[in-house]
Amino acid sequence: MGIKNLKSLLLENKSLTILDDNLYKVYNGIFVDTMSIYIAVANCVRNLEELTTVFIKYVNGWVKKGGHVTLFIDRGSIKIKQDVRDKRRKYSKLTKDRKMLELEKCTSEIQNVTGFMEEEIKAEMQLKIDKLTFQIYLSDSDNIKISLNEILTHFNNNENVTLFYCDERDAEFVMCLEAKTHFSTTGEWPLIISTDQDTMLFASTDNHPKMIKNLTQLFKFVPSAEDNYLAKLTALVNGCDFFPGLYGASITPNNLNKIQLFSDFTIDNIVTSLAIKNYYRKTNSTVDVRNIVTFINDYANLDDVYSYVPPCQCTVQEFIFSALDEKWNNFKSSYLETVPLPCQLMYALEPRKEIDVSEVKTLSSYIDFENTKSDIDVIKSISSIFGYSNENCNTIVFGIYKDNLLLSINNSFYFNDSLLITNTKSDNIINIGY
């Protein structure tokens, strides 16, 4: 659940490390994202009785380690989650239909088991039937709520367990807010127990060490500013609970080493991070990039986004070119687009040295409005006259690609209003810089 791949990305970035759970016996309080853990337990058992027994056993075990356990429980409807709920219902129905077909098949097959080890085979198949039946039961969200509420009544009079209801707010969101308050008074984060990867986004906003646990693993998380940036970037690209992500892009452990990471989650930095491949503008659609980035920032920082209108999904191309439009349009306002490239270059370059009379004559000889083909030697000569170099540039100002004049950002990529070329795939580009 939550932000896809975030846990594996933070592990890859070395800020999240796996620890031996048995070595850590005592914590300064334990905060639990109840629904995520409840669902994780439910997926491992065969019936409500077993679910109740196992869940209570987990909570009692946490009490022994933390002294006090706070169960954060979702309650009420979250308006901005309607699209997420609709999508989950759709996938839940597909999963339920698939499991019902599987149940029918198992129920039919068990009748035909005979011969050697018949009882053992039937017992194994019956376990599978029981588990499928229970999973189908839990595919109804009302059944999940009813069964969870019934289990929670076992803790009503337990002074070591607090039931913290989160009205119209996600439990993991409220849990991390309360964890920050806990830290401000005790100087230490409580143990966070959750399977939702949004939790790691919320936990990345300060550099204090945290212990985070799911059902099977214990992690130590010591985030840097770069990890916070990575968490936000992953929420933006891969999607989170309230934003579906950038269609056509995904951050995975396999491509993480190609992505440039920063400390500040700014539009320029984000586009630089995304520029690990070439992109071409496919539509003229523009999106409100600032609104999307502000939403991700506010969500990660645990600001109250529940009154916001969440941004709509867009393609990675729409995001990138919408983000770059302002820079290109500012440049284009002082850019002669309809003349041959040598003339464009003379107009666009700001001299970095004095140009003498002989060089002016040379430049004049290059003005040919009838010749639409660009000569590489002419391009290099113009650059040199204006005080620029084409090789070993510390700062790249422009790139020339197939008679296109491209801007450069951070020496990381080149772009105009219709294409972006990463500097790792720039063999055919002439650099102009210093």
Curated annotation (Swiss-Prot):
User: Its GO biological process terms?
Assistant: DNA repair
Q: What class of enzyme is it?
A: hydrolase
Which residues does the record give as Mg(2+) 2 binding sites? Answer: D196, D198
CC annotations in GO:
virion component
EC number(s) from the headed UniProt entry: 3.1.-.-
Which cofactors does it use? Mg(2+)
Record note on cofactor:
Binds 2 magnesium ions per subunit. They probably participate in the reaction catalyzed by the enzyme.
On whether Membrane is a keyword of this UniProt record, the answer is: no
Keyword Cell membrane tagged = no
Question: Where located?
Answer: Virion
UniProt superkingdom: Viruses
| Record-listed Mg(2+) 1 binding positions | D33, D74, E168, D170
Functional description taken from the UniProt entry? Putative nuclease that seems to be required for double-strand break repair, homologous recombination, and production of full-length viral genomic DNA.
What is the protein name for this chain? Putative nuclease OPG089
What's the source species for this entry?
Answer: Vaccinia virus (strain Copenhagen)
